[in-house]
């Protein structure tokens, strides 16, 4: 297979710029997490969620006043739309179900609403702690499984750089949540785990092509590992972008047309899909190329042919490929 482009895009030649952009985004994410902190849903910290539906012309100020008079002055209120009807999503730290129901009923009465206009969900702190523990275990097991799979299928260096790209993606997504103060819910955690799969897929596709081209290239064809990696990215980048764009269409529809629950999932997925595609060629592949070039075999080839860049990498390595 030849590159999709008449002239290859020099991704590896711009690796320092790409890695610097990623480093800046990661630093901004860490700053956001430290400075603003993360807002967790009641599923993680325990508390109450009151979903007011079909509230008509009631304003957010009126809702806050009603909640304050009912004993929920510290509750957070956000507007929500379900099936075209206006509503509100209220979150508070109340963990006693009886108290939560009493407060919800009092607020509804003050606003002229009935029991049919709201639902109350209360989660105790123990359940929230279990959710945190389960989510942490899920992420740890996923990372270890990725390292094991990529190491066995390809090599250890590829597994570490693939995980580095995943950490890059997840850190930036969490940073966005810190800066925007959007609550992290179990749906967000599910989205993060899904993003790990998409990001890993993009990276493995590139790694697989690098392996194939590396077997055909090398000293005999005067091909450095940097050149092999760059050509491999150019071979698969169009397919990767097309796959991402195709996936973004239903996710975007889910974000704008779905309810609050679907929007939580879709928001993380929108960010993660873009980051996963970016990190595959801007983080994982450059890091692998830099690491592999230090190996004696590839270091020797780099020293001999590293300055030879006039001939497109694909002219020889791709001959006879589909």
Q: What is each of the regions a protein language model found here?
A:
Residues 1-322:
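A structural signal for conserved, well-ordered secondary-structure elements
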